[in-house]
A protein has these predicted regions:
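N-terminal helical cap/lid subdomain that shapes the substrate entry/recognition surface
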Residues: 3-13, 17-98, 105-110, 123
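Substrate-recognition "cap/lid" segment bordering the active-site pocket of phosphatases
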Residues: 93, 120-166
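Well-ordered alpha-helical segments embedded in enzymatic catalytic cores
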Residues: 99-103, 157-160
Length: 166
C-alpha cells in the first residue's frame, strides 16, 4: 500500500487503541442492574461503539416499553462512567493495545492525518489519549458521542470524519 494515497486514518478507541471493553462491560452490567434494566456483559459487546444515550434508550424500551427520560439518561450514564473509571483505576489504568503506539508513530511519519472516531463520550478516556499513547491526537480530529446525532453502527461518525479530513 502506498501511504501517500492515504490522507487520513480513522481509529476507534475501545478495543483498537485501548483494551477498555472489559471495564465497560462490567460497568454497564452493574449500573443497568442497579436500575433494574436487564443488560449483560455480552450486550455491552454487541453495543460497542454506540453512544451511551442510545444504549440506555434501547435498554429502557426493552425492559419498560418506553423511552428513557433525559434525567434517566444523564443519571445512568454518569453512574456508568464513574463505575468505569473506578474499575480502570483499580486495575492500574486503561491498557493500551499491544503495538498500537508503533502503528501511530508510523502513520504520523507518513504525514497522514490521524483521527479518533469513537462512540465514547467519556472525557476521561478522551483526555487520556495523548498521555497513554504517543502525542499524535488533536482535539479537532476527534469524532465522539458529542459530535453526532447517530452513533455507530450508523455511518454518521465515519462520514463526519471523512468530510472533515478533506
Amino acid at each position: 500500500m502506498n501511504s501517500k494515497l492515504m490522507r487520513a486514518y480513522f481509529f476507534d478507541m475501545d478495543g483498537v487503541l485501548f483494551n477498555s471493553m472489559p471495564y465497560h462491560a462490567i460497568a454497564w452490567e452493574e449500573v443497568m442492574k442497579d436500575h433494574d434494566l436487564p443488560f449483560t456483559a455480552y450486550d455491552c459487546y454487541l453495543n460497542e461503539g454506540r453512544t451511551g444515550e442510545s444504549v440506555i434508550r434501547e435498554a429502557m424500551w426493552k425492559a419498560r416499553n418506553r423511552d428513557a427520560t433525559p434525567d434517566e439518561i444523564k443519571q445512568i450514564y454518569t453512574e456508568k462512567s464513574e463505575r468505569f473509571n473506578l474499575l480502570a483505576q483499580r486495575a492500574g489504568g486503561t491498557v493500551v493495545i499491544d503495538g498500537v503506539a508503533e502503528v501511530l508513530c508510523y502513520v504520523q511519519s507518513t504525514g497522514s492525518q490521524i483521527w479518533v472516531v469513537t462512540g465514547s463520550g467519556m472525557r476521561s478516556l478522551l483526555d487520556n489519549l495523548n498521555n497513554a499513547l504517543p502525542p499524535v491526537f488533536q482535539r479537532d480530529r476527534m469524532i465522539t458521542a458529542f459530535d453526532v446525532t447517530h452513533g455507530k453502527p450508523d455511518p454518521e461518525p465515519y462520514l463526519k470524519a471523512w468530510e472533515r479530513s478533506g
